[in-house]
Amino acid sequence: VGGDDGGAATKDREPKLRRWVDRRPLALSVVVGLVALLGATRADRSPPLFAAGVLGNRDVLVSVPPDQAGGAAYLEGSTVLRLGDGRLRYLPPGAAEPVTGPPEDPGALAVAAEERAWLAAGTVPGATAAERDAAARSLLFLRLLVRPGGAALAAQTPYWAYVWPRDASFTAAALAVTGHRREAAAVLGFLAGTQRADGTWPARSHPDGRPVSDGRPAQLDAVGWVPWAAWLASDQGRDTDLAARLWPTVRAAADHAAASIGPDGLPPAGPDYWERQERAPTLGTAAALLAGLRAASHLAAARPGRAAEERRHRWARAAGRLAGAVAARFGPGGYQRHPAGGGPDAAVTWLGPPFGPPDPAVAQAVRTTWRRLTVAGGSVPGRPWLGGDPWTPATASFALAA
């Protein structure tokens, strides 16, 4: 809440969010374009094959296996695949299977033209051609992964063809800040439909909205990420119609987030984006709830009525308590995974812009954590993965914070 969370919240002032959120939409879109694995850190078994790409239309998604991708490349600004022999492979509208046509196949070129028009209707950020290409590719894949009804799949494989609330929230945020608010609203509409009565979400859902019954407990960070995404998708509350439609979802989530803050000012222990059972509060959950409470308080300021005003004050106070506890409990150790340690955690990137106000101590912790988690030029999420392969979402989170 502004630059001094505790003080501002104590005085119930409106959160001053706009000044530090409208930054680097490229990095945000890249984070989300490749964040499909963020909520899918575990699978029931090792997948026998990873997809090299995806083809799709509004109704069907098809993975491109690596053994079929040799020498292939997507046409610029589209999901039409040019094979090594020059032929074009794509999924026509309404088709159930990919079609392979000649190099100038009119159907393929029409699909590519429509996708380029969709990109042009928004913004494709980036300072260089390579950055713009990465952002465009991410946005096109996000568009494909958002299924009819707004289900934003984590990936097009049997292991991850589900909706994780945090993945979907980041997807909605990326689509919103790049000018594709209709798609962002659809994603948030799906999340609204899968929200539980207590304001929480299942750890993941099927594309038809049914919860996945695999024994995973609810992950509390969803009650932070969804309000944050709703705030961005509604143009920070300026789209009053969308803000009004999402208000019941935001209200229930933020009420639960505020009620979850314990006497120590922190949320309870529980799984976060690592999807592991925890014995102590994690930085990832605390950062998500802090972003969500700030965003919800801002949205409440634009709502009519005494009840909304009371909630704004309550959520701002909860954000102030949480921010103070994060600084007091996590700060002395350099913002590690747990208050008592636990090693570096990429979630430190979620404490500063564009999720929260600038803080020199947080900025220093981000730089230190990056150095400790860097592997082969990228980043792993935390200590357990040191020596392993970098994670794109963790790496992109540091890029966003840079």
Name the predicted role of every residue range.
Residues 24, 32-161, 185-186, 190, ...:
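Low-complexity, Ser/Thr/Pro/Gly-enriched N-terminal "stalk/linker" regions
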